[in-house]
Amino acid sequence: MNILVLLPANDRHRAILESSAPGEDFIYTSSDAITREQVADADVILGNIDPALLTACEHLQLLQLQTAGYDDYLAAGTVPADAKLSCSVGAYGQAVSEHMFAMVLSMIKRLPGYHDLQREHRWEDLGPVTSL
């Protein structure tokens, strides 16, 4: 089985991947450097690939996206009919929640405005701030 990995993977990550599927062939590349031959030979693709390249697939069994979104891969004929498409829905929920919470706090404390004033070397009061 040929497993095409488009995710950035250091030596530790590669060892983990390869130990999970001993004896399988792993090919590491990036979305920018991928070739049609690599796609044609892949049984499994881990990572996001240009959907147009999927027409080169000859025996793809699984496409595991690294993102939650998958709309670009839903067009008819994009992913071979007998292949499974998997994405990372739910993997980023906590990080997105924390980011939104940080942005709300930033806005109620007027941090963007104070940041702009600081860059301009102006020390002014932007008015009252609210509290949670």
Located regions from the model:
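N-terminal glycine-/charge-rich "phosphate-binding" loop or analogous flexible N-terminal tail
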Residues: 1-44
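Active-site-proximal loop/helix segment associated with metal-binding centers of metalloenzymes
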Residues: 126
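Phosphate/diphosphate ligand-binding glycine-rich loop within oxidoreductases
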Residues: 41-120, 129-130
